[in-house]
Regions:
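Active-site-proximal beta-alpha core segment in soluble small-molecule metabolic enzymes
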Residues: 4-6, 10-14, 18-21, 28-205, ...
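Active-site anion/phosphate-binding pocket segments in diverse small-molecule metabolic enzymes
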Residues: 2-20, 24, 28, 70, ...
Length: 377
């Protein structure tokens, strides 16, 4: 047995007050619709246990995760809310779903029949959310098969269809607005098919973060919100859209481990991909690609030191990154370095990092590894 001591200065600071601020901003926009907080992938890297706890304390009733394992982590942490498992119920998981009061997203007839049989064997009724593919092309009953799916499900005596839902594929793209509205219309027709056979879902939902902002008609009585809760907006809403006042929840910081001056011709890092053309001041910081700083930022990304944008030079290593702090004023061992967050007048957001390497903000924060302690404030 040993006690873990986290003295390495690379940390992710999670601002739970910003999280609740964002929740309240979203509530003002979505009105009477309940909010389902999407906390899959460890709350997009922010820490699902604590984030879900704070959100439940603030009145959130619904949570969405990807897997049974993620759902059980929330239950073990004391979460008593409703939990939707978007990844469905895999064979052999039925008993755990029943025991822990979890709700599966169901998207094949094989799934729903298996859950019905397991519910019958346990003398109970299984509550499910039926997922339809209205244009995403991923998992879900095809929208044009709603009549036949409804006919099968109405005969299953141990299934309670609490919700019918779908997922927008391009709500963030103004050029695809007509298709987004078509998806919403398709969901209406799916619901009608179930009403025709006597199945009336108590909840219907299709709106994700961009859908809830840009398409008010899609809010229905439940919205699934992920990115906006964590303060992402720059790359999940169109550039021309007025952005809601959501704040980044994660700050990623470290400290300088060593400073040295290099001369013209000196190289930095593996492969000698950076060779100094003049005298430069180089700082090494204890964060690398294992911590979640993408290696593709090598010789491309920047960090903030003393409020000054300081470029990454050389290749990012597994545990270390080198930065040029020549223009950053006095820099010494222990000087704070901001990878995500504000320092003085400048701010680096996850979407800024993502944009420089052709990815999305979600991938940046989801990629921050467990080696980086989350500090909740």
């Amino acid at each position: 047995m040993h006690t873990q001591i986290h003295n390495r200065p690379t940390i992710a600071i999670i601002d739970t007050q910003a999280l609740i601020h964002n929740l309240n901003v979203i509530r003002q926009i979505t009105g009477n619709a309940d909010i389902m907080a999407v906390v899959k992938a460890d709350a997009y890297g922010h820490g699902a246990r604590i984030c879900a706890e704070k959100l439940q304390d603030a009145g959130v009733k619904w949570f969405a995760v990807a897997t049974l394992g993620e759902a059980l982590e929330l239950r073990e942490a004391g979460n008593t809310g409703r939990i939707l498992v978007l990844g469905g119920c895999w064979p052999g998981e039925e008993k755990a779903f029943f025991e822990f009061g979890l709700t599966p997203a169901v998207f094949t007839l094989e799934q729903v029949r298996r859950i019905d049989a397991a519910a019958a064997a346990n003398k109970l009724t299984a509550t499910v959310h039926l997922k339809f593919d209205t244009g995403m092309g991923r998992v879900g009953f095809r929208y044009n098969l709603a009549d036949s799916v409804a006919d099968v499900i109405r005969k299953l005596e141990n299934i309670d269809v609490e919700a019918i839902f779908s997922h927008f594929s391009a709500a963030d793209n103004p050029a695809e607005s007509d298709f987004t509205r078509l998806q919403n219309d398709r969901l209406d027709k799916i619901i009608d098919a179930f009403l025709q056979v006597g199945i009336k879902p108590r909840l219907t939902d299709i709106a994700n973060s961009p859908g809830a902002i840009l398409f008010p008609e899609s809010r229905r009585n439940l919205v699934r919100i992920g990115g906006l809760l964590y303060g992402f907006k720059g790359d999940i809403l169109p550039i021309e859209t007025e952005k809601p006042d959501v704040r980044p929840v994660m700050r990623l910081e470290t400290e300088v481990a060593q400073v040295k001056t290099i001369n013209p011709g000196d190289s930095v890092g593996y492969g000698r991909t950076f060779v100094a053309g003049e005298k430069r001041v180089i700082a090494t910081i204890p964060i690398g690609y294992y911590d979640g700083l993408p290696r593709s930022l090598s010789n491309k990304g920047s960090v903030l030191v003393n409020g000054v944008l300081s470029p990454i030079v050389g290749r990012i290593s597994m545990d270390w990154t080198t930065i040029d702090v020549t223009e950053a004023g006095e820099v010494k061992e222990g000087t704070k370095v901001t990878i995500i967050g504000r320092d003085g007048e400048l701010e680096l957001r996850a979407e800024d990092i993502a944009g420089s390497i052709d990815t999305i903000s979600y991938e940046i924060t989801c990629g921050i590894s467990r080696r980086v302690p989350r500090i909740y404030i």
